[in-house]
Every structure is written in structure tokens, then in C-alpha cells.
Amino acid sequence: MENLDALVSQALEAVQSAEDINALEQIRVQYLGKKGELTQVMKTLGNLPAEERPQVGALINVAKERVTGVLNARMALFEEAELAAKLSAESIDVTLPGRGQTSGGLHPVTRTLERIEQFFTHIGYGIAEGPEVEDDYHNFEALNIPGHHPARSMHDTFYFNANMLLRTHTSPVQVRTMESKKPPIRIVCPGRVYRSDSDITHSPMFHQVEGLLVDRDINFADLKGTIEEFLRVFFEKELAVRFRPSYFPFTEPSAEVDMECVMCSGKGCRVCKQTGWLEVMGCGMVHPNVLRMSGIDPEEFSGFAFGMGVERLAMLRYGVNDLRLFFDNDLRFLAQFR
């Protein structure tokens, strides 16, 4: 047992003199490992008489626990010191400015849609929606578009079959509203529409807002005043507006609406092709045939309708020269509209 006491004293002295964790690990292996000195002492129990083994074994276990306890305590001190040094080296200067979170923003097309809807709801219009997959009747027939009209061509319309297609305008929503409600009707119909066309000013899918007002004694002056006020509020400036005679199957009379170029104030530039004018929408008085097919008596009621491309207005408002930029999902472009 004297040898055991000497061995324990030697081990404790080695633990106290250790200068780092690596040295402690070597001491642990030397005294407590599988081939460690204290472990070897335990293996000598077989040489002792049977009656002495329990007592001697208990003493050896106490010795091992003592060395293990001191070694672990010393190890904990080194680990705490090492952690403190590491934390000190990696300290954060909380006075430095933080990165902050980048906030998102509405897509310019969404902004434009909301701006249009806000104006018309403010003057008493409701918002109506309808299916994007339409039948031939509501997309063409009910809007006085004859079978030989170019819009029915496969080159301009996406067909599923002979009767079902992707709507080419939001006018079917107007028809469905007139079929289900009695005048007076005041609605705008925002939504996605689809046409087989793609270039810098056209996309196979784009957004459109169409408006409809049906009531007694509605005339072209009401239409003219509504559109002029909308353009003034939307572009936040006084703009000259002109109505050019045009043709749409679902309105009579029909007109294209031009406004003074917002880029050059009507002086002529590349955007307006040196004319000083920009085409912004189509409009007209609702054709009697359209009213009649929707169950409204054209002798008693009249109305006007208009339609505008949302991307077109967004391009003019924000000075964007390629419609396809709106759908490229390039954050460098979209971040400009936050």
C-alpha cells in the first residue's frame, strides 16, 4: 500500500504541475489508461490472498477516484481559461452599426394595379373578377365579336379546344356582371389576360383593367370626363388628352385615348416617336348588341366601357422601356421600386 500512496502522490503532483490540457491528457493515460500505472496495480489483485482482495481493491478504487477527481477539476480550470480567452478574442463591438434587414417592396405592376383600383373605388366603382379560362361565348360572342374577326385566330388566342380558351381581355367579366346584376352597374375588372404575342412592348401574359358603367342617360361626355380625371390623378399632372375615333366590336362609338407624352411634355421624343402623344387605352359607348345579349334593354339603359394595359401604364409612369423587365424577376430592377 505504501507503493500505492507513493503512486497517488506522484500522480497528483504531476496533475498540479501540468501547464495545459494536452499535458493533463498525457497524465490521465499514464496513470488511468488501459495500461496506466494505477490500472496495472488493480491487475495485481490476483496475486493476493482471497480474503485481502476486497479491502485492497477498495483502496485502489479510492486512489483512482482521487486522482480522477483532481485531474477533472484541473481540466475544468484549463477549459474555462481557454473558453474565456476565445470569447475575449471574438468579442463583438456592439457599438458598430448593424447590417439590418432588407425590406421588400411591392412589384411595380402590383403598385400600378393598386393605384388604378384606388382611384375607381374612390369614385364609387366596385371590383369584379372572373375566370381566366373562358368559354368562346363570353370571350367573343357576347361581346359582338363575329366568327370571322381576326382576334379569333389561333395566332392571337390560346385555345384549349374549340370552345375553351385563355381569356384575351377582362371584358367577359363585364358580360358576366351584366348577366347577373341589374343596372346601375359601376365596376372595374382587373386581371391577367393572354395573347399570343411577345416583344419589348408585348407579353403572352399581361395585366389589364377594364371598366364598365351602365345606367340611364349615360353619354360620351361622362366617359370623357372619367378618363381625363383618371389620367390626371394617375400621373399626378395636368395632361392634354385626345380621343381618336377607332373601332371595337363591343363599343359604338369607339375611341383610342392618347395623352400628352409624359417624357417630353408633348414636344416630341423617342418614346412618343416624335409625335408628342402616347396611346394609353381604348374606350367607347357599350354597343346595344352587347347590352341586349346580357339581358339589358338598350332603349332604357346606356353605358360606357374602357380598357387599359397595366404594364403599359407602369412603363409610362416609371420610365421603363421594355415590358419584359417586369417579369424577369431581376432584384436589381425590382429594388428600384421600393
Curated annotation (Swiss-Prot):
InterPro entries: aa-tRNA-synth_II, aa-tRNA-synth_II/BPL/LPL, Phe-tRNA-synth_IIc_asu, Phe-tRNA_ligase_II_N, Phe_tRNA_ligase_alpha1_bac, Phenylalanyl-tRNA_Synthase, tRNA-bd_arm. Keywords: Aminoacyl-tRNA synthetase, ATP-binding, Cytoplasm, Ligase, Magnesium, Metal-binding, Nucleotide-binding, Protein biosynthesis. GO terms for molecular function: ATP binding; magnesium ion binding; phenylalanine-tRNA ligase activity; tRNA binding. It comes from Pseudomonas fluorescens (strain Pf0-1). This is Phenylalanine--tRNA ligase alpha subunit. Coiled coil: none annotated. Its EC number is 6.1.1.20. Binds 2 magnesium ions per tetramer. Its cofactor is Mg(2+). Tetramer of two alpha and two beta subunits. GO terms for biological process: phenylalanyl-tRNA aminoacylation. It is found in: Cytoplasm. It comes from the Bacteria. GO terms for cellular component: cytoplasm. Pfam families: Phe_tRNA-synt_N, tRNA-synt_2d. The gene is pheS. It catalyses: tRNA(Phe) + L-phenylalanine + ATP = L-phenylalanyl-tRNA(Phe) + AMP + diphosphate + H(+). Belongs to the class-II aminoacyl-tRNA synthetase family. Phe-tRNA synthetase alpha subunit type 1 subfamily. Mg(2+) binds at E252. It is an enzyme of class 6 (ligase). Its main location: cytoplasm.
